[in-house]
Amino acid sequence: MLKFKKTDTMHVNIRRFCLALVACLCMSGSVSAIVRNPMIWADVPDPDVIRVGEYYYMVTTTMHLMPGAPIMRSKDFSNWETIGYLFDRLTDSPKYDMEDGTVYGRGQWATSLRYHKGTFYALFAPNDNLGGDTYIMTAKDAAGPWKIHSRLRHFHDASLFFDDDDRVYVIYGTGEMCELTSDLQGVVPGSECRIFQREADETGLLEGSRFIKHDGKYYLLMISHVWAPGRYRRQVCYRADDIKGPYEKKVILQSDFGGFPHVGQGTIVDGNDGKWYGVIFQDRGGVGRVLTYMPCRWIDGWPILGDEQGRVPDTMPQGGDEVRSTHLVTSDDFSNDKLSLYWQWNHNPIDEAWSLTERPGFLRLKTNKIVSNVYAARNTISQRMEGPRCSASVTLDLRHMVDGDRCGLAAFNGHSGLLTIVRDGKSYKLVQSNTLVHLTDREKAITGVDEDVVEQVDLKRCKKIQLRIDGDFTPGKDIATFYYKIGKGEWTPIGEPFKMQFDYRRLFMGTRYAIFNYATKQAGGYVDVDSFDYSREE
């Protein structure tokens, strides 16, 4: 629950009048709606965006979460909704089931999204095995169902490209390219080549390929990490008259934004209005990698990003006429018999260990494997957290927990802040703790979890409880605070403010709201989640 400053009646009435006036002007066409950056103040990294008709479609990275590779849709760059996923689960490795390791921070990365002659295409390479496959998936509707069209060798951060003559290419790595067979089932022999050589100032990573053709020229957009003093990121573009080169390079964006380091990695897209736009992400602390939206101006044949000063603007005109307000994170009363698209599981779920139908109106989470910590638990379910401030609470029915069970709500990441209900014999206690997971570099196997218990409260024979976590992602904060409520009482703070962090060495994503339930002694218990109530300060 978010709290805002109270104001007197006169100020409230003035504010209501102003809002009504703006609404009327907007409906009459006198005022253009705006998009405030970050366009999406949540973890939505590695975007690829295309336009098909009146809609913009976007795919992003969700790594170890299932279902994976969310497909989002918008008419205006402001109101985005998740309409589907490329896959429900990945099964190439037992690590997706948390066997022989995990895929924390790996899994699905940097997907390329395309539309060609009535078919949507998506290409991605799971990053859990660098010698593994690249998937090409197809669908007639971006919402799905998607099916595997072919599997190729590994292409890192690749872009799929259909040329005007219907020849198909994959541009990947650091300026590498190959042609695919016309059926997209393999690589044309002898077609592999490098289309440019890294320059001396490119001292760090050069990746995140996005390839387009405009006015007869070929353009490759990439992120450039420069490890020189100052360590900065920028968006660069390589341009050529022939797809195989020679290519020339230009820096098209080098800008920080909102008190955070430089913006880099994303794509450009042509708008419904004939203009071009850039969608580029930015590392923004504990909330993760957020999306910024900016003009793309063609100057001397180069796609120059940012405003007239080359910077990410604070606001942008809304790029369309969407009349609905849509969201990427929302409340859920679990009244449907199918799980909402807002939710993602941590790794592949155990389907028989959860239900929306055994007790209608509740999400039932059953214990399964016996584990010692939340990072090893199966069937943890999550949604993103959002800036600038957000709040989420869950209502839990605890009556069917058994000795040793642990359930609760987390600000979940490699560093997590937890509200945990512990069943100990016949009693219950509420624990606010902070955890840090340790993972092996190669297999991402869990080698240990550090836990700092900040505060615990004896709940005696509690049957039902509400848990709440507030997130503050305003610059310089990244703070989670914790509360609980029993019955019709007031919200009671517990523990201490927790500093949320983004750590690429661990989960490599933004902090998420996560609901968990696991057994430490014996399987067979379960909790019923009555509701998930979410709010965000716009």
What are the roles of these predicted feature ranges?
Residues 2-19:
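Bacterial N-terminal signal peptides that target proteins for export
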Residues 18-29:
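Bacterial N-terminal signal peptides
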Residues 32-538:
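Carbohydrate-active catalytic/glycan-binding domains of CAZyme proteins
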